[in-house]
Amino acid sequence: MGRFRLVSAGYTIIFFPRRADPAELSRRFLMLMNAFDKPVQSNTEQTGRGHGFARMFDRVCAFLDERVGGASALVAACQSVADRFWHSKLYFPVCFLMLAVFMAAGLPVVGGVLVMSTLIFLLLFCDDLLSILFPVVLLAMVGTEFYDELYSLLRFWWIGLLAAAALLVHIGAYARAPRNGGCMHGMVAVSVATLLGGLGFISREEYFSPTALYYSLGLGVVMLLAYLLCRSEADRARDYDVAERMLQILYAGGLFTGFVVALFYVRNLQEFLQDFATLYFKYRNFSATMLLIALPAAAYFAAHDRRHFLSVAFLYFMLLMTGSRSGLIFGTAMLLLCLAYVYYCNPERRAFYRRVGLISLIPAVALLIALVPRLFASRMVDGALISPDDSRYTFFIQGLLDFVKNPLFGCGLGSMHNAPIFLGVEGSIVWYHNLIAQILGSMGLVGVVGYGWLFYDRVRLLWRKRSRTTMAFALSYFAMLLISMTNPGMFCPMPNALLMVAMFVVVERQPDTAAVPVKVGSASTPERRLF
């Protein structure tokens, strides 16, 4: 069936062997994959679609018009609605409330189905793939209501098939041939590492178990495909600041996570009021991760509008309320970095910030000293927040021992030989709870090369694109690396790894900068950058 040329580092990928008339079939296949060979505008402005999948789609609509009538008008109306919704100020509030109301009412499945339906609608009728990212984050938050029984959600497999079909339609209608933006080679290396991890050690049953495949494929090949899909639309002209929209998605995801934590305490208010100590819930480390990477996004908007400092305070307080020690330690460090970021971005307000900082420093420290022992009383062991017998120490040593057992490929992401030490919730692998130990123990030297390559690509990209906006992305990435030192973090495919992939695709499209610009003037004026 010919060949599809992937424009990336000069490689040509042949998907199918040649048969019949290669030239003709190749031409048709390229027309299908490259449905739009020039930048397009929003859905409401697409009037000249005349080739590839788009032309075939128009013919289908014309056929339906003849048989049913009004199909083309209906599709055009749906495209207009999707486009207006994505670009409106109602997008985030509507998506947020769509799930929040039903979760508060104890009907998370209903809210999840509504969010998934919105995601499918946007895939079919919106040409901007970024529009589905916040619904994906919301769907991950639905899982907090089923944290002990995630497999029970498999009964909704049918709506997943509908979403997959909608994704294929979206790819055919809107995507173009992707190009490497700077991170692809590192992602290919990670894909190889996750697939080869455990070679010569892990059993066939463990390697091909559904949970193991979810992580080995989800962290590698699936993220690579997600990167290529995002890159296929990255060069299209937009009429909004894409970097700012990505920060809004991180910000909104953090706010919704804060809502989920607050909802838990509302449901268990009587128990909390007994001693004012944080309560245990199994998804606290996942919540801490989402809150932590959202802090820099909130700080970015606080640098523009001081009202967003309330959100910064809310996110940090919810980090404390998770009861996660990682949230306390890394959250405090990130809060200080975010405040320094706001200070740096507003030279005209620095004198005011210095006065506020000096006045509030002692009360803030005193408040933390008073609150932390009470809030984290349930986490204390012999008066210490971190016990020398903590399982994380055991797992770090175990990761090094597993690396010694099979230094080239490690023991594999799906290996269960450490289950007697610690076994997580249903649907999770046996974590080492440390980024370095996870790479060494699960993937060996191949993993070191893969993740080291990806880390180098991303850091180099952030340095080359450095600006006030990309500094916020750099802080979010740093937050993800921090939380990964004590928790799964970046080794959770959905939504953690996916958010990082989408974030760096946005960074790739930022202009190169020789130095970090300091914007002088009104801090309320946003820095506008377009693809």
Regions found by a protein language model. Give the residues of each.
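A juxtamembrane structural motif centered on a specific transmembrane helix
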Residues: 6-11, 16, 26-91, 304-305, ...
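N-terminal signal-anchor transmembrane segment
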Residues: 34-35, 58-172, 199-201, 480
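Aromatic-anchored transmembrane helix interface
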Residues: 156-167, 183-201, 207-232, 245
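Long extracytoplasmic/lumenal interhelical loops at the membrane interface
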Residues: 382-397, 401-405, 409-443
